[in-house]
Amino acid sequence: MITIEQFQQVELRVGIVKEAAAHPKADRLLVLKVDLGTEERQIVAGIRAHYDPESLVGTQVVVVANLAPATLRGVESQGMLLAASSEGALAVVRPAAPMPAGAVVR
């Protein structure tokens, strides 16, 4: 288990998907360009089996904004998209109401 202090270090922010495309080297991954208000980030997400890239453009998502960059199959990811999954289903985590890009999720 993590402590509340450790959890408070995680920076969750609302982002708006500006672009989405299939990862060139991975069947399960999408490469997203996400507006976080003060900057745009590239995020690689394992949601390709559940979402068409075009359906994500313009939608709001919740991302971990202070995660160290990682390279996934040759493409840098500058954050992590949050999603819920159960019994093979997957749903991207979104704010319940429209929020500005970069809004803090608490």
Task: List the predicted regions and their residue ranges.
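Phosphate-backbone binding interfaces of nucleic-acid-interacting proteins
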Residues: 1-106
